[in-house]
Amino acid sequence: MKHLNVEFFKCCNSKTAISEVSFLLDSEDKNKLNQVPWAKYNYLPCVHFAIAYGSDCIFLKYYVKEKYIRAEHVAPNTAVYQDTCVEFFIRFEDQKAYYNFEFNCIGTMLIGYGESKADRKLLDGQLISQIKYQSVINNDRPGSDQYWELTVAIPFTLSLIHI
């Protein structure tokens, strides 16, 4: 298992502008995602991410380059996995259940908590609205790969609510 060094942003919290968080994450180490999670889908886009935390939240920024992008789902807890998306999983030491955060390229979120995909319960839409995000899509060069970034700030208070 790879260990990540996660920086503490002492100047940032859930009230910090997401654009400022995005800028700060640009100076952090980029971690490459280089494994295809499903055998039957062998397409591997170029994906990196940066991670840090503040006094009351965790910050993530994804940097993605791929052939095509799709963003059809705009409501919370809809099938963003059918769109161009990224995921983040977190489990706390004393629990069997984990959180699964899925974000499409425009920031629509699907968030669940459970011990497996089959028994996951979805977070309430009002809780999801506490997560700040910024999406940037740059597809101004026809015929070339599409590039997008997504920055999110996930409040620690969400992890205290086990649906």
How would you name each of these model-derived features?
Residues 1-161:
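Structural preference for beta-rich elements and adjacent junctions enriched in aromatics
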